[in-house]
A protein has these predicted regions:
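Acidic/glycine-rich C-terminal interaction modules and beta/coil loop segments
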Residues: 39-48, 118, 123, 127-172
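Short beta-strand-centered aromatic/proline hotspots
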Residues: 93-100
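Residue-level detection of beta-strand-connecting loop/turn positions
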Residues: 89, 117-118
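Solvent-exposed loop/turn segments at secondary-structure junctions
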Residues: 60-61, 89-90, 103-104, 149-151
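Short polybasic amphipathic segments
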Residues: 110-117
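Protein maturation boundaries and topogenic segments
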Residues: 1-91, 159-173
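Structural motif
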Residues: 50-51, 81-82, 102, 141, ...
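Short, solvent-exposed secondary-structure boundary/capping segments
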Residues: 104-110
Length: 173
């Protein structure tokens, strides 16, 4: 006597789809796009406090998921780009105002000023003394300054930012 058992048609395994969704979501967030909420007014009027931004993590290279730098780099930030990088274990959003090789000029007449192209940025005496010996942006670095430069802690305070430490470019706000 032969017994034939009918197999039930396979039902979709919901857990497979959930795990696949989580996996692909993590890959997208780590390597492709990230949504961040900006804290602070240093980038006003371009980006306001508590505003959400979308960062393309592939703009300059592939991010090292276990560090604060790019693993493989194919492009450098250029002046005008709004970039995201780490400073003291915090993500920072600033505008690249000069890239490697760009000339920097300083003035101490009636206050301290940094001249980059057509733009002038105020400096404190301490910032002036820290920066005045750099006639240009060093190779592999950028000068990153907040658009609201009167209320920004940026490259004028902590120095140039290494291109390899830039994690992405703001593409939408």
């Amino acid at each position: 006597m032969n017994i034939i058992m009918k197999r039930k048609p396979s039902e979709p395994n919901l857990w497979k789809y959930i795990l696949a969704g989580i996996f692909f979501g993590a890959i997208i967030k780590i390597f492709i796009l990230d949504i961040l909420s900006v804290k602070g007014i240093s980038m006003e009027p371009a980006i306001h406090d508590n505003e959400k931004i979308i960062v393309c993590n592939l703009s300059y290279g592939i991010i090292n998921p276990f560090g604060n730098s790019t693993f493989i780099r194919w492009k450098n930030a250029k002046p005008g780009d709004i970039v995201v990088y780490f400073y003291k274990n915090n993500l920072v959003v600033k505008r690249c105002v000069a890239a490697d090789g760009d000339s920097l000029e300083y003035s101490s007449n009636s206050g301290y000023t940094l001249h980059v192209g057509e733009k002038n940025y105020p400096l404190t005496e301490l910032q002036y003394n820290l920066m005045k010996n750099s006639p240009c942006v060093p190779r592999g670095m950028i000068l990153a300054i907040g658009d609201n430069f009167e209320n920004s802690i940026d490259s004028r305070t902590y120095g140039f930012v290494a291109q390899k430490n830039i994690l992405g470019k703001v593409i939408f706000k």
